[in-house]
Amino acid sequence: KAESSTGSEAAAESVESRDDLLGLTAAEAKAMLADPLMILVNHTNQMPENYTFETAECGSKTAVNKTLQTVACNAFLELQKAAAAENVTVWMQSGYRSVSYQTNLYEKKTNYYKQQGYDDAKAKEMAAAIVNPPGYSEHNCGLAADLNSPEHTGLDEGFENTAAFRWL
């Protein structure tokens, strides 16, 4: 059976045989799974190759990648506005990444580990622990963003100690 561009069509069809729908009716679960934003992309779930979407620019001047899927961009701008109303500053450090950009990040990290003396397989494994391989990053579907604030500009756990993190 062919999958839709989000993979949700096959998931929606499997709802009929499930009894663990978290209190949803089968119709409600099917409707939710038919939503093109209901996509799971991570280190074990690759983004469908034919997944397409429109982007909008919503990042700060310093953002590496300033775009997100239009719906995510609009949500981020609303979030940013609400934070500002409470004197909290939050910005997008990095948003949508094309698969080719993700490939570059992943290969750069892999090559770093190879230069440290690791073989190809181990270097790729170590790189994947830090930078998801192309097609396996939430950033590739335009629905993920790395956020930051003036209190902490690094892309690490230090953000947890900021007013922006507490506000979020």
Which ranges hold each PLM region?
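Extracytoplasmic cell-surface/polysaccharide-interacting catalytic and binding patches
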Residues: 1-95, 99-168
